[in-house]
Amino acid sequence: MIVGVSGGVLFAVMRLSPNPVLSGVAWTFTWFFRGVPRYVLLATMGTLGILFRQGLGLGVPFDWKLMELFGINGTMRFATLDANSLFSGLFGAVLGLGLSEAAYMAEIARAGILSVDKGQAEAAQALGMSGGKTMLRIVLPQAMRVIVPPTGNEAIAMVKDTSLLIALPLIDELFFQLSSIGSRTYKVFPSFVAASLWYLLVTSVLMVGQFYLERHFGRGFGQKAPKDKRFARAPGMGGA
């Protein structure tokens, strides 16, 4: 979720940028990752290691081609990572869910930024604040009132979507572990009930956190100004 929120804010700012290149890159990113189902994206991440048969290494690019060209055995790398293990494990899971969530969070953050009156940013710039400082200190704090509620919903949905990690050979995932226990003990239904209760517990904690965050960032909005009793009309006094 951290990857999704930080990436979403970044792409939201890029989408609102007057630079057509940044805006186009952000639009393409949100268009692609919002359109591809998460299960398909995770399954693709699990097989992404096929594209890197020689692994991911730090050294001379395409070193194996150079070695074949000169007929030399060995590599010109300082370190090598197994791409299959990398993309089919925790890294692939975080990358797949994070990129997908960033696309949705980009639209949520963009809507929150647009909800802030433009006069706020203009006033900050008139005081000499830079664009980045205006965004961090003026616009985003006010936009949080709009951003927090859908972000809480996305966090809850993200927790539930971790069950889709069964598309990856990630044996540490909750649903996979409980399904394996049910298959070994031939008690599938109790395992599914246990998984449901665990997900319900985690999402309930997130709902409580969402409630307090909404109350914190919603302070001062939608409240009527208190009446000053000093200027209240005396009984029996009518208007002119």
For every predicted segment, state its role.
Residues 1-240:
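Transmembrane alpha-helices and adjacent helix-loop boundaries
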